[in-house]
Amino acid sequence: MSPKSSKVAGIDLAGSERRATGFCLLEGNRARVSVLHTDEEILRAVGKGVRAAAIDAPLSLPRGRCCLKDDCPCVGKAHFRVCDLELRRMGIKFFPITLGPMRQLTLRGLRLKEKLESRGIEVFETYPGAAQDIWGIPRQKNPQGLKRGLSRFKVGGSWPRPDVTKDELDALTCALVARDYLRGITMAIGDPEEGLMVLPKTGKRLEV
């Protein structure tokens, strides 16, 4: 199966199963998006045949950290990963993983990664806000602008509907990064021993 026709998943993960997670299954130029909640729903939606999954959630801890607990001796270690610092150098805004709500998201992301990898799926972290910045299209704060920007990829399917959510648009962004990853046209930032983040190659701006 060629990378062009391979099936990939994009997951805009929420920190809690009570909140909406955006999900996208992308095969070739057809995308199916939905809003899910539980890990079980996500695993069921991934189904079979997915080669790669890109998740919008931290999937590694800063060097020297064994956990994100405040009462652990490791709390005095690093608060930023190398990939986080590289985002900062690129001028891309992000939330540090030691920030309150991000801790829960990180732990959920790590659990989901393990479950997906047990199925033989290649799983990696991405950041749709960074991808959108690199492509030169609006972030989800401007959903109509983001929708117009993503339409430049000429992807059909269920996602262009009028009531598509911000989470689903970010999930589609993640899936597009996963597809580009299989095509060998992405870059990885960070420290391989600590954890990498996969993003579009810089200079790939779109005309919006």
Name each region found by the language model:
Residues 1-208:
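Phosphate- and other anionic-substrate recognition elements at nucleic-acid/protein interfaces
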